[in-house]
Regions:
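His/Met- and acidic-residue-enriched segments that coordinate or traffic transition-metal cofactors
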Residues: 1-62
Length: 62
């Protein structure tokens, strides 16, 4: 595997921050809404963001 440049690491770090925040927000919203279907959709969205977060983390060996 090739080494990542500092710019690439910075971009991945920014993406990790964004994905983590989106995951947390979607999970929080899924617990506060009263509509069951909307809650389920928000949970799925949170899961997708968590998967992307983990994939990005894997890029930097975390």
């Amino acid at each position: 595997m090739t080494e990542l440049t500092s710019k690439e690491l910075g971009l991945i770090s920014d993406a990790l921050t964004a994905e983590g925040l989106l995951c947390k927000k979607a999970r929080a919203y899924s617990k506060t809404v009263t509509d069951v279907d909307l809650s389920s959709t928000l949970t799925k969205i949170a899961d997708e963001h968590e998967q992307r977060y983990n994939a990005l983390l894997g890029l930097i060996g975390g």
